[in-house]
Structure formats: C-alpha cells, structure tokens
Amino acid sequence: MLIKLRYPLSLCFIGLLFEASLSYAQAALDSRAAETMPTFTISFDSDILDVAQDGRLLLLLATHDEQEPRFLVNTSAQTQLIFGLNVQKWAAGSELAIDKNAVGFPLKDLSAVTPGTYYVQALLNRYKDYNLSNGITVSLPPDQGEGQRWNRKPGNLYSTPVKIEIKENAANNFSISLDQVIPEIEAPIDSKYIKHITMRSELLSEFWGEDVILGAHVLLPEGFDENPDAQYPLMVFHGHFPADFGGFRTTPPDPTLEPSYSARFDLEGYNIIEQQEAYDLYQAWSGEGFPRFIAIEIQHPTPYYDDSYAVNSASQGPYGDALTYELIPYIEEQFRGIGEGWSRFTYGGSTGGWEAMAVQTFYPDEYNGAFIACPDPIDFRAYLTVNIYDDSNGYFYDSQFQTLPRPGHRDYLGNVHASQYDVNRLEAALGDKGRSGQQYDIWEATFSPMGDDGYPQRLWDKETGVIDKNVAQYWRDNYDLMHIIKRDWATLGPKLEGKLHIYAGDMDNYYLNNAVYLAEDFLEGTSNPYYGGVIEYGDRAEHCWNGDHENSNAISRLRYNTMYLPRIMERIKQSAPEGADLTSWRY
C-alpha cells in the first residue's frame, strides 16, 4: 500500500512541476512574442486625399515579391498574410497603428508573425455612408466599376511595397505612407456587335437613397442593322461582374501574344486558347443559319459584392424586380427584343447558375428556360458541407469529443485545400458586418434579414461558426430554392415544366453537387406535372462543369453562349404561343 501510494504522490509532484514549467515557458514565449511583434504606423498626406476617411485598413505581408502583396492573399496553401481593422474619420497627416488588435489571416494576429524578411504594403478600402429609405445609415465600400475587388478599386489608397526585416527580440516598428491611388477604369468602347448601356433604376435608387445605375453589355445578332423589322429572343448570361462582354472577338488570336500558363487548368498557352474560342464564337455568331439572338451580360454590383444575386433582398434592395422589370425591358426596347416571357432564356455558372435558377423560380412567367451550371447552393440542406437546419456549427462537424473541421475546398481527387473556417477567416480580416466583398458575406447580404444596425444578420457567428436557427429559418422560407419549389409545386410546377436544366461536376471543388443531388431527388419524383427538365453530372469534374461531356472545363466554360442554343431552339418550338414571331429573326 505504501509503495503504491508513493508513486501517485511523486507523479502529482512531478505534474505540478511540469505545469509550472509549462506556464513559465509559455510566459517566456509570450514575452518574446511581444518583444518581437511588429507594429506598423500608417498615414497618408493631404496631397493624396484631403477628406477624412472611413473604411477598412489592410496590412499585407509577403515573403516574396513575385507580385505586390495585395494580389497574393487567398485561401490556398500559398497565401501570404493580411491583417485588417476599421478606421473612422481618419484624417490626412494623422497616424494609425496596426497592432495585435487587427484581425489576421491565416495568422490570428501580428503576434504570430515570425522573424524574417517580408515585403509590406498597406491599403485602405474606402467606405461611404448610404442613407437607406428605412432611415438607417450604413457605411459600405461602393463599387467603382471594378466589381468589388478591394485590391483594384479606383480611389482606394495603397502604399508602394517596401522590403523590411522583422528581427527577433527587437523593437520592430515600421512607418508606412499610403502614397498611391488606384486609378479610374476606362469604359469599354462600343463596336458593331457589342453595345454598352446604363440606366438609372427607380426601384433601387429609392431603396439606397441615391442614384443606382444598372448596366449591361449587349451582343447584337449578325444583320441587326440590315434587318430593321426583325425582333429577337433574348439570352441573359448571368455571372460575376463583367468588365465587358467576354469571349467574343472578331479577329484571330494575336500571333505576337506570349503564351501564359493557367494553374487552374494546368494548361500552357491558355490565353491563346481563350482568344481562339472567342474568335470561334464570332465566326459561328456571324455565320449563315445561326439563330439570331440578343445576348447580354449584366452589371449589377452592390456595396456588398460584385453582383446582387439578381433577387430582391432585405439588405441590398429589390434587384430582382429592377433587373426583370426595369433593365431587361429597357434593353429589349432599345434593341428590338421580342419582350415576351417565351422569348427569354437565362443561363450561367456558379453564382450565375444560382441566379439563372432563382430568376426562373421567382419570375416563372418572365423566362422560358434556365440552364443552371454548377449553381451555388440550391438546397440549404447542402450549403456546401453544412445542413443549416440540422447542424449546429458551420465550421465543425457535430461531435461530442472531436473537433472535425468542415472542408471548404477540394480537388477532383478529394484532397482538401481549405476549410470552411479558413475561407470565413479571410473574410473577417477583409471586413466586418458583411463588408468583405467575398462569398459567404454576399450570401448573408442576399439571404439574411437586415439587423437593427442596418447590416445583414449572420447565419453563423463569424468567429465560432455557431448557427443562428432563426436566420436559417428566414433563409429557408425566402431563398432556399428547392424548399420553395417543393412548397409551391402545385402552383409553381406548371410554370417550371420543361424549364430547369441543371448541371454539376460530381467532384465540384465547393461540394455544390451535393445540393443538386437533393434537387434531383425531388424533381425526378414530381408529377402533375413531371418537371420535364434535365439534371446531368460530369464524372470527376470540378467547378464549374456545365454539361459538356466531350470537353474539359477549360474549354466548355468558354462556350456558354452557344452550347445551350439547340435546347433553347427546341424549347421555343415546343412552347411559343400561337401567333408568336418565329420568323423575323430567322434570316
């Protein structure tokens, strides 16, 4: 008994000594980290900007100078460092310190930065006040024609990158001057085939308390001027902010173009492939026998993202109504569109895929078919890897004893490259209150109710991932497309019959195929009516597979404007009402 007793006593004593030594060691590490932790003092001169600023001040550190640090932050394993904090009424000549209080990614804060050589840069993503029609004022980053890209936004201030040395056990204090301003973006130029239009939206201007301009790039059919009596069907290509109408050129690839490598597709000379595909589109578009359509790409950026998701929302306003009832009729009036629901079709991939399905669902009589590629989650039971109704946390699987991170990005072999937490942590560094301009924040800006402060309510806590079930319920009732379709099938089904064409790769990088499986389970079981559409999968295909079983994503992503035309023409043949104009545009 005595022998048995001695060992526990000895182990207890050793344990106490071990805990004490660990505490001492941790304190020593914390002390050294505090001594080594860099601080950065940021300022700008009045000759750069003479008005006090609100916004998000970003500090960027990179271990190499292959590009400026502002272009090296992402969720890949190669990402460099970013730290962000809010500034208010920051005046020229005054100094602001970025220290441990700044939110970091992928490191938590500046105290985790290790000694070494870095290239440092600072950038101010400027905000402005919006006095909303409900009486609330919000401070947000306005789009400046760049599609909510903080590192390229005209008017944002930034510093010239500087090489620094962070030393161990030294006072690492650095001063940075925001000495550059991102210049304005030149507007695209009209050509014979492509026109660029803008219009003031009455609906959105009322919501935002100031003028809101919508835009579109319009690809006109061959023979538009020579056939003044022709009226045309419309194809709406939904997607991210387009600087111009993409993938169309009237000349062969530039013979002097230096081939560039695409890391995404592991292809050398992908820029030449893009130019060839764009020229091929022109040749088909202008060739004999090709259906004469108007095709458009829409510009509808918001202060939250590069596009509005094309639906009405509490925090962004009535974009769905503005696009469907203001912009599209305006385009059809300007360019002789037929202007009837049977003659309008919509398509797109990823964000554009969700938008195509959403506008077809919410405005079923205004469109005659949606071609929905790799859509953002169309069933929130598969919000990527989260069931927002049954799961309790967006970052970790529910487990009593384990901490199992939810994946956020994979390759076609299933290798995980980023977690849900990683992606959201980057957003937290870029901005709070949904102001990062990134993916999860725009989903909340679109799907969530507005909070009392005027900003979107969080689906989950940005730090912990804990899901707010009240917000999840709001998402389900208003934006879960498959929940809405199932709920309203008796009345909605007849209006969607034959109109839904859904495509996804079964190894989509963002697990978006999971929601498509759930959609298929319901749609294939429908009756009175049977949905009568298409659901197809690409074997081992990543994001964003769009239904092409013959070519890789690298090629098929460049062919949206032609690949669905056979099915569109068949749909018109089947569904055009008696007396519809089926001839003036067939020349």
Q: What is each model feature region?
A:
Residues M1-L2, M569:
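N-terminal hydrophobic targeting signals that begin at the initiator methionine
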Residues L2-L11:
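Bacterial N-terminal signal peptides that target proteins for export
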Residues S10-A20:
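Bacterial N-terminal signal peptides
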Residues A25-A27:
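Boundary at the C-terminal end of the N-terminal hydrophobic targeting segment
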Residues T63-G104, D109-Y587:
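Non-catalytic cap/lid and distal C-terminal segments of serine-dependent acyl enzymes
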